[in-house]
From Swiss-Prot:
EC numbers: 1.14.99.-
Keyword 4Fe-4S on entry: no
Disulfide bonds: C192-C197, C199-C220, C240-C247
Pfam families: LPMO_AA14
Signal peptide: 1-17
Gene: AA14
Alphabetical list of Gene3D superfamilies matching this protein: 2.70.50.70
Field pH dependence: Optimum pH is 6.0.
UniProt protein name: AA14 family lytic polysaccharide monooxygenase
Keyword presence, Cell inner membrane: no
Organism: Sordaria brevicollis
């Protein structure tokens, strides 16, 4: 009992710097060794920064590309509906571990005020508060959270997934911030091929830490779809700020940024692209991605 208490205190009190999405269908669930179920794993959580393409793509730097979910397990995407995942700093603080006994409304398993925010001085990050909690969220408050996204590729074999066939299909503003996050699915998203699709959870924080990015692997399946539409070939995104006329219209690739190679977007110093209108991504389901 004492050992369990010490472990939980250690996990909850650590100064985490990162967040990932936890749900069925994820790669590296329980760690990067499919033979071992580590319920306290955070290996999928670490960000991607200044890495060669061969390492950042699909989290190959930690072997997550080689740790798929069990056969037949998918993240279900209901066409025209919504799906919910858990954003957390460690699998321990989700319902995928310990029967959900360590979950709260927050990604770190802690308890925070509903209007949790950083101080109104300097950059004002959550981690600038006494105690330094909240650094994982890279934000001042919920409103300033940069937004997260999901992309889909209609390639059942992940070896065939590329930037030019991986299309962002939904975004969620003001995330990551709370544990539960619900994303909208375009109604015209077509069914996946036999063996399912590849999906990626995506995030580029806006300040409050290292200028990194996130790409997390999933096997996914579009459910309830009778659509015969096809997804367009995505274009690289462009940072457009407040001038929407400069934004890329239609299907867009994920943001590949601040890596040694493989980047598809460049910004001025201090400018952060994100899965939001400043980089051409509308809020919610991306209904303009079809041919």
């Amino acid at each position: 009992m004492l050992t369990t208490a010490i472990l939980f205190t250690s996990l909850a009190g650590s100064a985490y710097a990162h967040v990932a999405a936890f749900a069925p269908g994820m790669f590296c669930r329980g760690g990067n060794n499919p033979a071992v179920n580590d319920q306290d794993t955070n290996i999928a959580v670490n960000p991607l920064y200044n890495l060669p393409f061969s390492q950042w793509w699909m989290q190959a730097d930690r072997g997550c590309n080689l740790a798929p979910p069990p056969a037949g397990e998918y993240l279900n995407l209901p066409a025209g509906g919504a799906f919910t995942v858990e954003l957390a700093v460690n699998q321990a603080f989700t319902t995928l571990s310990w029967g959900g006994s360590r979950t709260t409304a927050w990604p770190d398993g802690g308890n925070h005020p509903d209007d949790w925010h950083g101080p109104d001085v300097g950059e004002g990050c959550l981690s600038d508060n006494p105690g330094g909690e909240g650094g994982a969220l890279h934000t001042h408050n919920e409103t300033t959270a940069a937004g997260t996204a999901w992309a889909i590729s209609y390639e059942a074999d992940i070896a065939n997934v590329r930037l030019d066939n991986l299309v962002v299909f939904t975004t969620l503003e003001h995330t990551p911030f709370r544990r539960l996050a619900t994303y909208q699915v375009p109604k015209d998203l077509p069914p996946c091929p036999p063996g399912g699709c590849y999906c990626a959870w995506l995030w580029v924080p806006k300040g409050c830490g290292e200028p990194n990015m996130y790409m997390q692997n999933y096997k996914c399946q579009v459910t309830g779809s009778t659509s015969t539409k096809r997804v367009s070939t995505p274009k690289p995104p462009v940072y457009c700020g407040d001038d929407s006329s400069k934004c890329v219209k239609g299907a867009k690739q994920m943001i590949a940024w601040h890596q040694l190679d493989g980047n598809n977007i460049v910004t001025a110093p201090g400018v952060f692209p994100g899965y939001n209108p400043t980089t051409g991504y509308t809020v919610g389901a991306q209904n303009d991605i079809f041919q």
